[in-house]
Amino acid sequence: METDSIDSVIDDDEIHQKHQFSSTKSQGGATVVISPATSVYELLECPVCTNSMYPPIHQCHNGHTLCSTCKSRVHNRCPTCRQELGDIRCLALEKVAESLELPCKYYNLGCLGIFPYYSKLKHESQCNFRPYSCPYAGSECAAVGDITFLVAHLRDDHKVDMHTGCTFNHRYVKSNPREVENATWMLTVFQCFGQYFCLHFEAFQLGMAPVYMAFLRFMGDEDDARNYTYSLEVGGSGRKQTWEGTPRSVRDSHRKVRDSHDGLIIQRNMALFFSGGDKKELKLRVTGRIWKEQQNPDSGVCITSMCSS
């Protein structure tokens, strides 16, 4: 893979361009405005990628700094003054960073947390307010956003089928089931209980044997996904195979869910048996249902809620 080369000298005015934002933190009933757009914060911003810098922070002989990732991109030349960078660490700036507390970068999406500088990255990688990645598995889609955006994106850009209701009944047909390559066959989105769920069905190699797998993902966080249960069933010729479990959150990648085998897995010989006929064509009908587990606030007993459709 080729690395980007940065040949132009960056103006000081561009380096120190302010990125104004603020957050609030409650202390003893009073609201404190946190405004990290200070000179110290700006010093910790890499002039090349504009991200916050973390150790090792590099500097040239004239004191211009940049992050370790961008150091390799500029071919050991300072992007500000063009002097050779060498291997000089800016230890003073690294030490100053230890004393800072900054808002989460998802403050504008609702996160009001304030974090020590060196803990901020870890929080942001797990922040409940961070955008969701596109759950479509047929391509490496880079789209991110909230659930409303992703539902529209799946419908309009990926042409995914949309259904309302908590039951599903789908038929999957393949003309030559003996030729199975890793491929996503279908993704369907269901809306029920005011939430969205993605039903995946695909074929892939499990060891030396081809298998078919169906599983459900919840379009939301894991804590909310635990409120729901789903069942899947496939059958034919007087036999059936069932699965019941909790949908995984779309925070877990499609590959992670698939590789954990957390769903209905159908071996090829069983899939052909369910298909009937001369076993030269795959004809699988997968049915299922989603329901919600709610706890009665008075008795503490879990109540199963089924939707009307």
From Swiss-Prot:
Listed Gene3D superfamilies: Apoptosis, Tumor Necrosis Factor Receptor Associated Protein 2, Chain A (2.60.210.10), Zinc/RING finger domain, C3HC4 (zinc finger) (3.30.40.10)
Induction pattern: By auxin. Induced by salt stress.
Q: Which proteins does it associate with, and in what oligomeric form?
A: Homodimer; homodimerization is essential for its function. Interacts with UBC28 and NAC021/NAC022. Interacts with SINAT6. Interacts with ATG6 and TRAF1A. Interacts with WAV3. Interacts with FREE1.
One GO BP annotation is: ubiquitin-dependent protein catabolic process
| Expression sites by tissue | Expressed at low level in the vascular tissue of mature roots. Expressed in lateral roots and in elongation zone of the main root upon stimulation by auxin. Colocalizes with NAC021/NAC022.
User: Localized where?
Assistant: Nucleus; Cytoplasm
**Pathway(s):** Protein modification; protein ubiquitination
Protein's UniProt name: E3 ubiquitin-protein ligase SINAT5
